[in-house]
Amino acid sequence: MSIFEQLSNNKGNISSALGKALAQKVLQENQMDILLECIDLASYQALATASRHIRSGAAKVVEIVAEKQPGWVAPQLDKLLPALSVQEPQTRWAIIRVMGFCACLNKSVALQAIAFAEKYIEDKQGLCLASSTDLFLGDLGAISREDAQKVFPLLEQSIESSIENEQDWLLEASYKLFGNLDQSEQAEVLQFAQRWQYSSRKNTQQRARQILRLS
């Protein structure tokens, strides 16, 4: 069965398992043809609701590979930009995360994704998309002081409009770019971390205190 056919039947729990299985074939067996096909399929029939399972499944494969081997995906990053405009959030959150994983290797394309991140923050559609967007901003802002200046206003906006349980990812993103912020910006991040250092959630406490140790 072809990759396209497998992804066409890609739904529910099968979707997650299939994405992981295909990604492992790329990572462990160097089946780069799978990766290249999934990059193309991440924006397949972008306006068609019926094709959303194909797009989201392909995007998941690309995300898993990009996390482990960003250099394999970075040269093709421009082909993934159209996937940031598709209707289903599953595809968008996977690909905005890919943009972060590959940002330091193909910054010119990753910078183009900022416009999409801005839209996602203005209209937050669930925790997965919001958190992936936050982490993208952190990854991009971690590259340089100049890049941090581009993304920090958006991260501030995301903090101000945070949704339930988003704080962990906002803290992680803030930690990533903290060293590239000026003193006043760092003070804002520290104030945000102080709000969460005594959270009832241990993971949140750890992330907050990780930032506070930088002061």
Over which residues does each language-model region extend?
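Hydrophobic, well-structured mid-protein blocks that either form specific transmembrane helices
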Residues: 84-132
